[in-house]
Amino acid sequence: IRLSLVGSEMCIRDRYTHVCFLPVAEYLNEEMNGYSTLGYFAVTHRIGGSDAFKKLVDDCHNAGIGVIMDWNGAYFGTEAKGLYDFDGADAYGYLKPSLEKHPEWDVVTFDYKKGAVRSFLLSSVLMWLNDYHIDGIRIDGVASMLYLDYGKQPGTWTPNMYGGNENLDAIEFLKTMNKCIAKRGDGCFTIAEESSGWFGVTAADNDDPLMFTYKQNNCWTKDFLEFMGTDPLFRKGEYDKLTYGMLYNYGEDFMLSLN
């Protein structure tokens, strides 16, 4: 409750329009900050459970602050209490080192070919929107969903039917999910955290987009924070950090954030 009051008051004071929460679905692995999801339909006990989170969202809405939550549909952990070997086999995915630069992250990538997997993930997203009145879903790790060779070494991955490295099943899942959320007509939106430069994340002037509402502009965030961290005496030669984003601004529907 104190978090609700303090958080909403701070947002009003600093004139924020939305807040984005780190993953609130239950997890065990503290090192991954909640991105190795254990329970896709359960609020983590760290914030007090379901009722406490509903109170937090309601307080934000009453203060005129929209609520966005991070959601991970790219991979899950190997904890025995979670989805790993759920039925004694690979019910939800298959093992792959999807984050090669962090070999200690033992994760399983979802197999989007399976109808049960697509239904499970879509049901999870809709549950957060319906039951907790979340305004927006930020999909984390979209790049790792889009590429079959993400984080893999040559010779350790299998190309798609066309010989490419695109994960065609994941692409179709993302399109279906975004279209389903858009059809709700209640203003809910999706944000892609996509770092590979994939063309066509949003519908802005793209022929075959993934249909995300927005793409998070991580480059702008990095440049802006670097500029603000520069001593004012030396900012004269750093203004290009504030204007560079206009070179690609109209290629996607970007969202600017300090996340």
Tell me what each language-model feature is.
Residues 24-26, 72-76, 142-144, 195-197, ...:
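Active-site beta-loop-alpha junctions enriched in small/polar residues
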Residues 115-136:
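Switch/coupling sub-region of P-loop NTPases
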